[in-house]
A protein has these predicted regions:
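Single transmembrane alpha-helix segments in multi-pass membrane proteins
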Residues: 1-45, 70-79, 156, 160-165, ...
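Membrane-helix interface segments
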Residues: 23-29, 45-51, 74-80, 122-126, ...
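Transmembrane alpha-helical segments in multi-pass inner-membrane proteins
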Residues: 28, 54, 64, 174-249
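Extracellular/periplasmic helix-loop junction at the C-terminal end of a transmembrane helix
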Residues: 86-119, 150, 243
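Helix-loop-helix "hairpin" substructures at the membrane interface of multi-pass membrane proteins
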Residues: 121-200
């Protein structure tokens, strides 16, 4: 189940970096927005988590588009610094707003996703549901990269000046890439919250952003199944190290 969650989340950074050439070190922020939005709606407002994860994904998209407005004017290194700062702002916000987010101790007893009364209360059920969403995300991603939008992303990555010369609105397409990336990662955040039923700010620190980027690079950028390979590979490595630590091999 964790593999499909992280595969979905890694699809966002892979699209942003692999196809549009924008380096974001803040995917954990969108992961957090999706997770906390869905968790808050479910625990405090009584919203069905099935709808909550999509609302969280939508808010993550809005946040991505808002960040993209100033970010579209920045070059790679300054863009990375800006996204790191955004990630820290989100991290500090969820720490500070204890009445809403639970603060440092986190949020507990987050309900499982329920579809027409059928509760996804096991890892296998969550795996199947997450796999369906992952397949849909990959279909959307594949359609995007094969469309005019995808070709515009690649043109911007290869040569921004040349892309502008061909009539590509660079700022608009950069913003679109940011928004789509945030949408995918926010969706994964919602899935994560209702899978583990407990979230805290430490789950969404800068290490999480590095993990997403590492998975994208490990699986191979500009690849449809790269996020799956990267997530599965690093999750396997993590399990091996935990096994060695437990049994002191």
């Amino acid at each position: 189940a964790y593999i499909v969650v992280y595969s979905t989340g890694t699809t966002g950074p892979d699209l942003l970096f692999g196809f549009s050439g924008q380096i974001s070190m803040g995917p954990a922020a969108f992961f957090a927005i999706g997770a906390y939005t869905s968790a808050i709606l479910a625990t405090k407002c009584g919203v069905n988590p099935f709808f909550g994860i999509f609302i969280g994904s939508f808010l993550a998209t809005v946040a991505g588009l808002m960040l993209a407005i100033p970010a579209s004017k920045l070059v790679k290194h300054f863009l990375s610094l800006m996204t790191i700062a955004f990630g820290q702002i989100v991290y500090m916000f969820v720490n500070a707003c204890a009445p809403l987010t639970g603060g440092s101790p986190g949020m507990r007893n987050i309900p499982y996703i329920s579809i027409f009364g059928y509760e996804l209360n096991t890892y296998f059920k969550n795996f199947v549901f997450g796999l369906i969403l992952l397949i849909l995300v990959l279909i959307v991603k594949n359609n995007i990269i094969r469309s005019r939008t995808g070709r515009a992303f690649i043109a911007i990555k290869e040569n921004t000046a040349a892309a502008e010369g061909m009539g590509v609105n660079v700022r608009v397409y950069k913003a679109m890439a940011f928004g789509i990336s945030a949408c995918f990662t926010g969706l994964a955040g919602g899935l994560y919250a209702h899978l583990v039923t407990y979230i805290s700010p430490e789950t969404f620190n800068s290490t999480q952003s590095v993990l997403f980027m590492t998975m994208a690079l490990f699986g191979g950028i500009q690849s449809l199944i790269g996020p799956i390979v990267g997530a599965a590979g690093l999750m396997l490595v993590k399990e091996v190290f935990q096994f060695l630590q437990i049994y002191q091999v």
